[in-house]
Amino acid sequence: MFSGSSNAVPEGREPPRHIAIIMDGNGRWAKKRFLPRVAGHKRGLDAVREVVKACKEMGVGYLTLFAFSTENWRRPQEEVSFLMDLFLRALEHEVAKLHNNNIRLKVLGSRERFSAELSERIDRAEAKTAGNDGLVLTIAADYGGRWDIVHAVNRLIAEGRSEITEEMVTDRLGMAWAPEPDLFIRTGGEQRISNFLLWQLAYSELYFTDLLWPDFDRAALQEAIHSYWQRERRFGRTSEQLPEHLRRDKL
């Protein structure tokens, strides 16, 4: 299990170890251009490619993207089917590129409602990139933060645990192998976390932008990281307890 971000004060002006993003605004991007919603999802995939490349080059260790929530199954069936097909085709065409760039791919979520073909493709993609030690790209699909916590608690019940600690829950979450996100980004103008990594975001720095996801690029990512650098991350401490180079007045 990876120690959480809240357990230690990170060093100064380095890129965040772990960035988590809610990629919001694909549908509105398409609507503004009088295009079908699916056109926004297609363009959103281009933004994913650019952000993954930028994170790799900046030295970010973990990038987690919220692609499809447990609540998204309520969307029109035509759109859901398109998103599942887009995910399948992205796995087919992008995994070799990820592998060649030493990127490890992981998929976080239930998978119970995925087709057998999609589940098999995910398994193959994870296996192919499992030995890579560069950027870890996690796609959260059919994922919800409440589901994650309940799943962890049910595992503890099945183990016969009578007293449950925070560490026990953390160890059984879907991303127990990764540090907690240092920086959370949401595009599209909404200011909520929408059932994404509820446990893990406890001490993350939150950054919201009005940019729609298809318009989010390297420059926008750099702006978010610059904002992150201006924050004073105390994790319950006082400013005076922080190393001098991490105090807000020294940033």
UniProtKB/Swiss-Prot annotation:
GO molecular function: ditrans,polycis-undecaprenyl-diphosphate synthase [(2E,6E)-farnesyl-diphosphate specific] activity; magnesium ion binding
NCBIfam families tied to this protein: PRK14830.1 (NF011405), uppS (TIGR00055)
Cofactor note: Binds 2 magnesium ions per subunit.
SUPFAM superfamilies named among the record's database cross-references: Undecaprenyl diphosphate synthase
Entry protein name: Isoprenyl transferase
CDD domains per UniProt: Cis_IPPS
GO cellular component, one term: cytosol
PANTHER family: DEHYDRODOLICHYL DIPHOSPHATE SYNTHASE 2 (PTHR10291:SF0), DEHYDRODOLICHYL DIPHOSPHATE SYNTHASE FAMILY MEMBER (PTHR10291)
Family in the record: Belongs to the UPP synthase family.
Active site: D24, N72
Record carries keyword Transferase: yes
GO biological process, one term: polyprenol biosynthetic process
Organism lineage string: Bacteria, Pseudomonadati, Pseudomonadota, Betaproteobacteria, Neisseriales
Role: Catalyzes the condensation of isopentenyl diphosphate (IPP) with allylic pyrophosphates generating different type of terpenoids.
PROSITE patterns per record: UPP_SYNTHASE
Residue positions binding Mg(2+): D24, E205
Cofactor: Mg(2+)
Quaternary structure annotation from Swiss-Prot or TrEMBL: Homodimer.
Keywords of this entry: Magnesium, Metal-binding, Transferase
Entry EC number(s): 2.5.1.-
Pfam family name, one: Prenyltransf
Keyword Lipid biosynthesis attributed: no
Gene (name only): uppS
